[in-house]
Amino acid sequence: MCEPAPPKPTQSAWHSFPECPALLLLLSLLLLPLGLPVLGAPPRLICDSRVLERYILEAREAENVTMGCAQGCSFSENITVPDTKVNFYTWKRMDVGQQALEVWQGLALLSEAILRGQALLANASQPSETPQLHVDKAVSSLRSLTSLLRALGAQKEAMSLPEEASPAPLRTFTVDTLCKLFRIYSNFLRGKLTLYTGEACRRGDR
């Protein structure tokens, strides 16, 4: 007598992910730095406070580690970074598109700065392994943050400014050490990025 054919595998295990928010969040955080999409991941993943907190903690850890770095943490040239100071009165009076543009441009410039720092460290005469690891992690994190902001609609809002609106040029300055670069990175995440995402997420919940 022929035995019955085994049942076909189902997708129930995979479809159970949306029923486990904590597991889905963990999977999203693991795959985001690799640039891999996560089936069922919420489009506004950055609205989960734990996500942004993770990147802020990484940035502050990198700043603390490089604070005592005496060798191999100075750059052979100055690197341009965004100004992270926030005038809260001015910020609240800014149009949503202007806020998005300032954050989007700042994140792009910060990404360029970290990449430039990565290249300078790699070409240093005596490269230090620990700072290099933190720079590599920052490069990956900034790519993930860019994807998260794009999913939140920041790029679309930044490009939706009317032609008659002339936003002020992005304020910048330069840094010459890895510690200063990571300090800017940390301040940007805790300041303008947190302010923008907080308001954008609240608007989406209305």
Curated annotation (Swiss-Prot):
Its main location: secreted. Hormone involved in the regulation of erythrocyte proliferation and differentiation and the maintenance of a physiological level of circulating erythrocyte mass. Binds to EPOR leading to EPOR dimerization and JAK2 activation thereby activating specific downstream effectors, including STAT1 and STAT3. GO terms for cellular component: extracellular space. The lineage of its organism: Eukaryota, Metazoa, Chordata, Craniata, Vertebrata. The keyword Glycoprotein applies. Disulfide bonds join 47-201, 69-73. Belongs to the EPO/TPO family. This is Erythropoietin. Glycans are attached at residues 64, 78, 123. It is found in: Secreted. Produced by kidney or liver of adult mammals and by liver of fetal or neonatal mammals. InterPro entries: 4_helix_cytokine-like_core (IPR009079), EPO/TPO_CS (IPR019767), EPO_TPO (IPR001323), Erythroptn (IPR003013). SUPFAM superfamilies: 4-helical cytokines (SSF47266). One of its GO terms (biological process) is positive regulation of Ras protein signal transduction. It comes from the Eukaryota. GO terms for molecular function: cytokine activity; erythropoietin receptor binding; hormone activity; protein kinase activator activity.
